[in-house]
Amino acid sequence: MSEIIRVPDIGGDGEVIELLVKTGDLIEVEQGLVVLESAKASMEVPSPKAGVVKSVSVKLGDKLKEGDAIIELEPAAGAAAAPAEAAAVPAAPTQAVDEAEAPSPGASATPAPAAASQEVRVPDIGSAGKARVIEVLVKAGDQVQAEQSLIVLESDKASMEIPSPASGVVESVAIQLNAEVGTGDLILTLRTTGAQAQPTAPAAAAAASPAPAPLAPAAAGPQEVKVPDIGSAGKARVIEVLVKAGDQVQAEQSLIVLESDKASMEIPSPAAGVVESVAVQLNAEVGTGDQILTLRVAGAAPSGPRARGSPGQAAAAPGAAPAPAPVGAPSRNGAKVHAGPAVRQLAREFGVELAAINSTGPRGRILKEDVQAYVKAMMQKAKEAPAAGAASGAGIPPIPPVDFAKYGEIEEVPMTRLMQIGATNLHRSWLNVPHVTQFESADITELEAFRVAQKAVAEKAGVKLTVLPLLLKACAYLLKELPDFNSSLAPSGQALIRKKYVHIGFAVDTPDGLLVPVIRNVDQKSLLQLAAEAAELAEKARSKKLGADAMQGACFTISSLGHIGGTAFTPIVNAPEVAILGVSKASMQPVWDGKAFQPRLMLPLSLSYDHRVINGAAAARFTKRLGDLLADIRAILL
């Protein structure tokens, strides 16, 4: 049978600033249903039972009071109700502190005379002593109503609105934004309109309230600092340890941050001293009375009684650990971040700093939707980062956009996905690898004669023997002879990773862009096997049937433009490889043999290399040896 879950006793009314559940949700005992905010505190209202939400009776912005319906709940079988006191105090630590620090206008002054000027002063703001004006809500000439907020103050423990004690017209405002004010400081002068004024003078509060008992002086020597009363939460998790052994701390300096299912709170030091040892660890569960640390305090003079209503008076030295204060993550300008426990937990799960999030809730409060929107924006930004990096060159000033249409007719043709990926990879390699290119010409007159002589044998085997298999075989031989060319730079930049295998990629020009299939174990295959595999991979690349795994794992790359033309070019190293061989069109050239010029078929070679790994002499030796091998391929057999 369904049950209506109602607002417990919250000491007044509150505005719904967050809905934490929706129809159909399966909820647990003590799971938050809504977050309410009153003039003095914000609090989560938990569910007293587990079950399924049948309907939600409230919406954002609703004003709720004790007994108002929140949801209709279909209890789970055998679900036990939560303790009554837990329901009655939805957010004990947060509410208790905020109420303790918030002013109570009805308990601190004598009534103002009707139809007369009245000075409105800062009421007793408790142990905070001083607070900063973070909002001024009225100006001279404004008509205000009794209980209308005049300013918003923020101390290190709470933020609070100061209400008007009576209706009237603001004659003058005595404070400014960001000013530090204390109990009894003048806020404004109000000309009342004959309504019964509410008390404001702080002296009355001081007279009505008994002075606190004198506090004992802090004795010199070690003192155990324990977890104070953390209310109905019972246990809380240590989410931050702010000090370590040997640290010098001041009185009221935060030591640890605790979090329960209802609130986050900082535990301050009761006295100044040096931390001797820390007894708690990150993520430990602690409760009231558990030891936090041992503090060696210096002897201090006893503090006398302090009248809470006296402005400008120094705070008494604490004799026991004070009540924990709600945590607000500091924003960039030093202000506190306002968010409920559920929102803080969500932010931690995403690894997000609350201070970086723009708030959309009432009075600057961060909502779950704000966290989700921030995470979504960051993910989109990360997704666009590679493209942005490729466009701008990772810090290099980008080329300014040009409106080409003003010069004549244009057509914008989208790049294929393959072209986009290739552009990003090539740009990354160009930016990260210090390129140098070594040029050489190889005499392949005899090699070409050998290739032509073997055409019939190759055709009988069903393959076409081109120069590429011969280049693959010669390069594989050199990669084993000169192992630095068959390596990659370690991520640390302090070592080389030498590969014991010889996999070589070769560039294939396709209608959609450049592809580089990889032939594995080139050193272990015959010329005819290499010719067959190269032809098969090239066909797959052109017909879009080449798998991703067929383009991975290369140690070295050959890019041949011999079938097109050209005398030389500077290929880009395919990182993390350290070298790439460019091959241009062979041509007959006159070569001096010591007696006369002889016609020889010369093949231009262009070796680009990573200068972090390969030096110029090594590159020259590589191209020289490659030229020798191509001039007499029989040397490979030795």
From Swiss-Prot:
Subunit text: Forms a 24-polypeptide structural core with octahedral symmetry.
Comp. bias (Low complexity): 90-117, 301-320
Cofactor note: Binds 3 lipoyl cofactors covalently.
A biological process term (GO) from this entry: pyruvate decarboxylation to acetyl-CoA
Physiological role: The pyruvate dehydrogenase complex catalyzes the overall conversion of pyruvate to acetyl-CoA and CO(2). It contains multiple copies of three enzymatic components: pyruvate dehydrogenase (E1), dihydrolipoamide acetyltransferase (E2) and lipoamide dehydrogenase (E3).
Name under which the protein is recorded: Dihydrolipoyllysine-residue acetyltransferase component of pyruvate dehydrogenase complex
PANTHER family, alphabetized: DIHYDROLIPOAMIDE ACETYLTRANSFERASE COMPONENT OF PYRUVATE DEHYDROGENASE COMPLEX, DIHYDROLIPOYLLYSINE-RESIDUE ACETYLTRANSFERASE COMPONENT OF PYRUVATE DEHYDROGENASE COMPLEX
Cofactor: (R)-lipoate
UniProt entry keywords in alphabetical sequence: Acyltransferase, Lipoyl, Repeat, Transferase
Family per record: Belongs to the 2-oxoacid dehydrogenase family.
EC number, UniProt record: 2.3.1.12
GO (cellular component) term, any one: cytoplasm
Catalyzed reaction equations: N(6)-[(R)-dihydrolipoyl]-L-lysyl-[protein] + acetyl-CoA = N(6)-[(R)-S(8)-acetyldihydrolipoyl]-L-lysyl-[protein] + CoA
Species whose genome carries this gene: Azotobacter vinelandii
NCBIfam families xrefs: PDHac_trf_long, PRK11854.1
